[in-house]
């Protein structure tokens, strides 16, 4: 199938199964956080996964290439991003296993059956409305700041849509870790696994990967840190493995 690119769009190679993704650099492009989340999340054979705030569909497409899950759905509120995601799915001939739904995370309980997903992933906006400078480009601002949804919205939605024993995987920023752990527990999502991501071995962490289980027992494993760069411009071997180079 021939997929036509619109003005400003480009095809980017995902280094996985020959998959490519349509993006518009002037709007928003996926970052390393999404790729790391796709490597951290686990989807078993036969399981159904949902990505909240999927953007251009990077996480469902990567998870389709990395796991044996049955079906992957991406939920995205921005019409332009959802359109790019749908066309990327068609370009990669994944329409039988990946679907994109345009809609609001806060209304996901009306879009999907409750307790219907085995796995939910999310790479939500990191910054609260009053934290940091809001990007003047609205698509970028929505992706980075809690303009259309909050951490509470994301975690509350995950609780509603996960089956009992279902898993929630999220990437976020360490400065909000205490708040994240409290909200997860409040919504019966027990933190089970955590990994801090450091840009360099001698720097502070700038990302945190978290796995929580709906209705799980209290016990969390802190995995060894993930170091992104061995030196400037040279990825750590683990990063190359996650990207699939």
Predicted region positions:
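Conserved SAM/SAH cofactor-binding pocket of Class I
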Residues: 42-133, 156
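SAM/dcSAM-binding transferase cores
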Residues: 204-245
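A generic structural signal for alpha->beta connector loops
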Residues: 18, 46, 69, 95-97, ...
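Mobile active-site "lid"/loop adjacent to the S-adenosyl-L-methionine
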Residues: 124-153
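General small-molecule cofactor/ligand-binding pocket signal
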Residues: 22, 99-101, 192-195
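Residue-level signal for inorganic ion chemistry
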Residues: 37, 123, 154, 212
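Conserved Class I SAM-dependent methyltransferase catalytic core
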Residues: 148-199, 203-205
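Class I SAM-dependent transferase core
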Residues: 2-45
